[in-house]
């Protein structure tokens, strides 16, 4: 499984209230959530980004409240992956559970800039910065995590397993 898109780089401690402001938590409709992803941090993000683009962030991405709305909004907006130096553990689990690929890759975060064209091979953990001609590495997902992501999340994965 691969992803390719432009990078959108943000800093450390991007919390779930910044990813999807609390005033929109009265809905769980992914399309509506996507309209407001990162709007308090980068009001133009939803207009500038294209499907497949990649969020790059610093330490502790997804900290704060435990809400599935945050990774759901990111995925619904068309973001293909998030690369960060580190993730809040609850965000990490929620992202996998809804099928949003996320990678911890501190070196990549240091080198990637907004606008760089990035390609990720999730099976190897290889991150290519096509703009700079550089290659970075992250730990690839274990096979069972890849199965969950490919299925579109834990619920879809479980449905498929139960249908067998």
From Swiss-Prot:
Reactions that this protein is recorded to catalyse: (2R,3S)-3-isopropylmalate = (2S)-2-isopropylmalate
Segments forming a coiled coil: none
EC number: 4.2.1.33
Keyword annotations of the record: Amino-acid biosynthesis, Branched-chain amino acid biosynthesis, Leucine biosynthesis, Lyase
Enzyme class per UniProt: lyase
Gene Ontology molecular-function annotations: 3-isopropylmalate dehydratase activity
Pathway note: Amino-acid biosynthesis; L-leucine biosynthesis; L-leucine from 3-methyl-2-oxobutanoate: step 2/4
CDD domains found in the cross-reference section: IPMI_Swivel
UniProt record, GO biological process: L-leucine biosynthetic process
Family matches, as Pfam families: Aconitase_C (PF00694)
Annotated TM spans: none
Highest taxon above the source species: Archaea
Sequence similarity: Belongs to the LeuD family. LeuD type 2 subfamily.
NCBIfam families documented for this protein: leud (TIGR02084), LEUD_arch (TIGR02087)
Function: Catalyzes the isomerization between 2-isopropylmalate and 3-isopropylmalate, via the formation of 2-isopropylmaleate.
Quaternary structure and interacting proteins, as annotated: Heterodimer of LeuC and LeuD.
Protein name: 3-isopropylmalate dehydratase small subunit 1
């Amino acid at each position: 499984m691969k992803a390719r898109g432009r990078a959108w780089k943000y800093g450390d401690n991007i919390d779930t209230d910044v990813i999807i402001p609390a005033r929109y938590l009265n809905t769980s409709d992914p399309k509506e959530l996507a309209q407001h992803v990162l709007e308090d941090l980068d009001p133009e993000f939803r207009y500038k980004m294209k499907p497949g683009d990649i969020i790059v962030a610093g330490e502790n991405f997804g900290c704060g409240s435990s809400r599935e709305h945050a990774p759901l909004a990111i995925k619904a907006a068309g973001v293909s992956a998030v690369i960060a130096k580190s993730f809040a553990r609850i965000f990490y689990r929620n992202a996998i559970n809804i099928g949003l690929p996320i990678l911890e890759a501190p070196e990549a975060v240091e080198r990637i800039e907004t606008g760089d064209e990035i390609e990720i091979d999730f099976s190897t953990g290889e991150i290519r910065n096509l703009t700079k001609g550089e290659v970075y590495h992250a730990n690839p997902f274990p096979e069972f995590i890849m199965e969950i992501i490919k299925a579109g999340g834990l619920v879809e994965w479980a449905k498929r397993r139960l249908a067998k």
